[in-house]
Regions:
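P/S/T/G-enriched low-complexity
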Residues: 1-206
Length: 206
């Protein structure tokens, strides 16, 4: 899967900045084969319909997920085409709210929906020439619910960026809800800030 920012024209302190990040390409198998939730090969006789490269030629496929709005899609394409999908070529994202992007990614891996702030007011211009998925399917499948235990599922998040990120106001995160796997982000943020200052802090790691 690939998450990314939408174009920002304001930083968070100025108000009115676009919240966090959005899903640009859903979780899937990008190669010739697919597998079920138990890791068993379940590739159809015609191959993986969402494969991102041609297994015969090795060429990348421009629109592997059959997007009808931009005719451009896929995990690899999103990574390869940073700043080159919108109307202005070479326009890269800035005022990056990395914490919010990371939080949205965690919600996706937990089987939760996107926050309303992340997907409200999404215009064609904000999509920047690439799909934005405002409804999500649980990437792990298996009939899990948002309150299910995801602790044993192995996940990895790779962040591509620079040091010039825009700190996010903690008030923009959803309210804590232990039953729905929404942790106390503000509390943990304060704990990390305290520890990074090499100060003492009491916290419960539950």
């Amino acid at each position: 899967a690939a998450f990314g920012y939408m174009p920002q024209t304001k930083n968070n302190s100025a108000g009115g900045a676009t919240f966090g990040g959005v899903l640009r390409a859903p979780m899937k198998y990008v190669g010739a084969k697919t597998y079920n939730i138990n890791g068993q090969d379940n590739t159809s006789s015609t191959g993986n319909p969402n494969a991102e490269w041609n297994s015969n030629t090795g060429e990348f496929i421009k629109n592997p997920d059959s997007d009808t709005e931009f005719g451009n899609s896929g995990v690899i394409n999103y990574l390869n085409k940073f700043g080159r999908t919108g109307t202005t070529q070479g326009l890269y994202k800035y005022y990056d709210p990395l914490g919010e992007l990371y939080y949205e990614t965690l919600r996706y891996l937990q089987g939760l929906p996107p926050t309303s702030a992340a997907i409200s007011g999404v215009t064609t211009a904000l999509k920047d020439g690439f799909p934005v998925y405002t409804t999500w399917n649980d990437p792990y499948g298996g009939g899990r619910t948002p309150s299910s235990d995801y602790s044993c599922l192995k996940s990895n998040i790779v962040v591509i960026g620079d040091v010039n990120i825009d700190s996010s106001g903690s008030s923009r995160y959803p309210s804590t809800s232990a039953t729905n796997n929404v942790p106390d982000r503000t509390g943990w943020l304060n704990t990390v800030n305290t520890l990074e200052k090499r100060a003492s802090s009491n916290y419960l790691d539950a």
